[in-house]
Regions:
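Short, conserved beta-strand element in jelly-roll/cupin
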Residues: 118-138, 179-182, 187, 210-214
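Double-stranded beta-helix
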Residues: 136-197
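Generic beta-strand structural signal
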Residues: 87-94, 104-106, 123-131, 141, ...
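Short, structured patches in soluble enzyme cores that scaffold and shape functional sites
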Residues: 98, 110-112, 131-135, 147, ...
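Non-heme Fe(II)-dependent double-stranded beta-helix
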Residues: 1-13, 18-119, 223
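Short edge-strand/loop segments of extracellular domains
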Residues: 100, 146-153, 211-217
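Non-heme Fe(II)/2-oxoglutarate
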Residues: 192-268
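Active-site glycine-rich loop that binds ribose-phosphate moieties when present
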Residues: 110-117, 131, 163-171
Length: 268
């Protein structure tokens, strides 16, 4: 499917995917890096942010993810980012979600308030690329997304992100649970209403998140990407030119800024 068709699907559904973008061996290394980063982050204040019971989000340094350059330079990622967010798109976030056994249904939500560019002008100005670390099965609390809801205004919602419970049935009717396999990439608007679901499996389900902005979208203020100069200089220029990050002598632990208060307790 041509990138134009993928963009059309994204604008209609709020999400689109590419199957088999990476080899399983590459994904296994990504999963190992995510879980190593999780066990480090959970031990320090602000390192892992709760997104509900037994569910966390962790931002990582790009150089702690061996596949960062591969992901940021992947032709489909670059094509989608350029087509949706423009040729000067910005890479503003790298991190991962991980639910464990006992994670509950999240409330239906979006990840930040909708800008007028989206709810008035019907333009998508930011993207989240997701890569699962495991082959997702029904007992792993699959990601559920309410198709086509990225255009909802949302200004009357709690924090402009959380629809009222009275509205949940509307989103449930449009909800589709996703079962990606290792190597797949999805691309979504984080404004499309979604939730993580109850996780009964003893196997954790980490999923990598690469955040992309159009210039001016402003989400870099929610993050603090940093890398050392030698790592930065070794990246391909095609990646470097899109990075919104600090170049530092020594990496320091990330203290996360994007805490979504309404997710802390879960929905049930």
């Amino acid at each position: 499917m041509a990138v134009e068709d993928k963009v059309k699907t994204l604008y209609e559904d709020g999400i689109v995917a590419l199957k088999g973008a990476f080899y399983v061996e590459w994904v296994e290394a990504m999963r190992e890096d995510m879980m190593t980063a999780f066990w480090s982050a959970i031990q320090r204040p602000g390192g892992a942010v709760g997104r509900g019971p037994r569910r966390w989000y962790v931002e990582i340094h790009p150089q702690d993810f061996r596949g960062f350059a591969d992901l940021a330079a992947h032709p489909w990622v670059v094509e989608m980012a350029g087509a949706v967010c423009g040729p000067k798109f910005e890479i503003v976030e790298i991190g991962f979600d991980v639910p464990f056994q006992g994670a509950k249904n999240q409330p239906w939500h979006r990840d930040f308030p909708s800008p007028t560019d989206t709810y008035v002008d019907k333009r998508i100005t930011s993207l989240a690329f997701n890569l699962t670390g495991v082959d997702v099965t029904p007992d792993m609390g699959p990601f559920e997304i309410a198709i086509g809801t990225q255009w909802e205004d949302g200004r009357s919602w709690n924090h402009e992100m959380f629809p009222t419970k009275e509205e949940w049935p509307k989103f449930a009717e449009r909800g589709v649970r996703k079962f990606p396999q290792r190597g797949d990439i999805s691309c979504r608007s984080a404004l499309t209403i979604h939730r993580g679901t109850a996780h009964g499996s003893p196997i954790a389900r980490p999923v990598m998140v690469l955040g992309i902005d159009a210039p001016g979208a402003g989400h870099s203020a929610l993050h603090d990407m940093m890398m050392t100069k030698d790592y930065h200089d070794a990246l391909p220029e095609t990646v470097r030119q899109h990075l919104i990050c600090r170049v530092v002598e020594t990496l320091v632990p990330i203290s996360q800024k994007h805490d979504i208060e309404g997710l802390v307790m879960g929905a049930e």
